[in-house]
Design a protein with these regions (language model features):
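Helix-loop-helix hairpin linking two adjacent transmembrane segments in secondary transporters
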Residues: 148-197
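C-terminal ends and interior cores of transmembrane alpha-helices
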Residues: 86-99, 306-318
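Symmetry-related core transmembrane helices of the 12-TM Major Facilitator Superfamily/SLC fold
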Residues: 172-189, 388-406
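Helix-to-loop junctions at the C-terminal end of transmembrane segments
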Residues: 64-76, 283-295, 380
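Cytoplasmic helix-loop-helix junction between adjacent transmembrane helices
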Residues: 112-146, 350
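Hydrophobic core of transmembrane alpha-helices in multi-pass small-molecule transporters
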Residues: 22, 91, 103-119, 322-335
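Central cavity-lining transmembrane alpha-helices of secondary-active solute carriers
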Residues: 54-69, 274-286
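Extracytoplasmic gate region of multi-pass secondary transporters
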Residues: 28-37, 226-287, 372
Length: 424
């Protein structure tokens, strides 16, 4: 197994998480905006009909807790990511052939939704990184979640440029090829559940390394799923996650169309979206290091409140310069959110059952990420403007940034009334 003084196998886990997050976010959020106008023109799909697409993710809710349990099982994550990526890639190829809205709903909404649920960039990747890293968790989570922003920096331009040079059908086909080639082989080769499975400890220690054993000891006590569900802290974190997603997803979903509504061509909208994604990518490492050194509650507030305020800046923007400025500022603060949440959960609940815990939080994320873009489409239909929608989404960020103040410090679970034996 690959491990030496200079290299830790866990960084391969981070690499796969980065790639999976990049493809998932790129094809599911950043790139989708480029298809709204051309598919709408050719197939007669309205903005509101496009906004229904995320609702099909609701079909995956019953299986998400089960997928979370599988992540905590040996070889479960490897099978999930490889199979999900293959299904997702095939679904994207099928989307290039659609002729009406219902075919689009089936191929992209249902089939691709099932594939990405199994791919689990926000379930599998952060859960595995939590298991493989403790002292270096902030930086590892930052690099892994950089893939989310890389979806906008790398995957979205692939879609946008392919559509501009060819057509939207070629755009879907290009995304299909990238999904299968970039994820399936690395997932099969590199994904392992936890360092203990290959006689290692988190952060690069071995079972015989006393120094790492000492640093590993505080992480031994982990909350089970049942203990977590009985905790007030768990539900506050779930609400913070929901509010952050409500501010993040619909802005990514509608930003391209909003910029085009302001009179800018697709190429300029691509530049703004790319700038936002690049800024979000760059911000993850600083927020990751802050999460290792500061109280994670303060880091959450430092990220979410400015993310909300900066959301409002796109509303008065009327020039390319002001749009680029918005992309830089909002992208920086918005981009730190997945990294900080990835660190916060294992900081409070430990790492052993993180897959099961995230498997319960994931349905909440799915519901919010499904309905919030639809709400944006409804508000646009009311007055042909996204102004009220962006005010609402910015406000959810700010509320989410205030909630960490209601959290106490991390503490061990109360085991008196919990059954630890079942590991749930």
């Amino acid at each position: 197994m690959i491990c030496s003084r200079w290299f830790f196998f866990g960084w391969l886990i981070v690499l796969v998480s980065f790639t999976s997050s990049m493809i998932n976010a790129g094809t599911g959020s950043y790139a989708l905006g480029f298809f709204i106008v051309p598919m709408g023109d050719e197939l007669g799909i309205s903005r509101l009909q496009f906004s229904f697409i995320p609702l099909f993710k609701l079909l995956t809710i019953p299986i998400l807790p089960l997928l979370g349990v599988l992540v905590d099982k040996k070889n479960g994550a490897r099978i999930l990511v490889a199979a999900g990526s293959l299904i997702g890639g095939i679904a994207l190829a099928a989307t290039s052939l659609v002729e009406n809205i219902w075919q689009f709903y089936i191929t992209y909404g249902v089939l691709y939704g099932l594939g990405t649920a199994a791919m689990g960039s926000q379930l599998v990747g952060p859960s595995l990184i939590s298991k493989w890293f403790v002292q270096k968790r902030g930086r590892a989570m930052a690099i892994g979640t950089m893939g989310i922003s890389a979806g906008g920096v790398i995957i979205a331009p692939i879609a946008g440029l392919t559509i501009s040079a060819m057509d939207w059908r070629s755009g879907w086909l290009a995304l299909s090829i990238v999904t299968i080639v970039a994820i399936v082989p690395p997932a099969i080769l590199f994904i392992r559940r936890a360092p203990e499975d290959i006689d290692l400890l988190p952060d690069g220690g071995t079972l015989a390394t006393e120094e790492h054993h000492i640093s590993y000891e505080p992480e031994v006590i982990s909350w089970t799923l049942i203990q977590s569900l009985k905790s007030r802290t768990f539900w506050i974190f779930s609400l913070i996650q929901a509010l952050g997603i409500c501010g993040l997803v619909p802005v990514l979903f509608h930003e391209i169309a909003y910029i085009q509504d302001k009179g800018f061509q697709t190429e300029y909208a691509t530049i703004v979206a790319w700038t936002l994604a690049l800024s979000a990518l760059i911000s993850k490492l600083p927020f990751g290091f802050l999460s290792e050194r500061m109280d994670v509650r303060k880091v959450l507030a430092l990220c979410l409140i400015p993310a909300g305020i900066s959301t409002f800046l796109i509303i008065p923007a009327t020039s390319l310069f002001t749009l680029l400025l918005w992309g830089i500022i909002h992208g920086f603060f918005m981009g730190g959110f997945p990294t900080i949440m990835g660190v916060a959960l294992p900081t409070y609940f430990g790492r052993q059952h993180m897959g099961s815990i995230r498997g319960v939080i994931s349905p909440i994320i799915i519901v919010v990420s499904s309905f919030s873009p639809l709400l944006g489409g409804i508000l646009w239909n009311d007055d042909s403007s996204y102004k009220s929608a962006f005010v609402l989404f910015g406000t959810t960020w700010i509320i989410g940034g205030l909630l960490p103040l209601a959290l106490g410090k991390p503490k061990p679970p109360d085991i008196q009334n919990s059954d630890i034996r079942i590991g749930l």
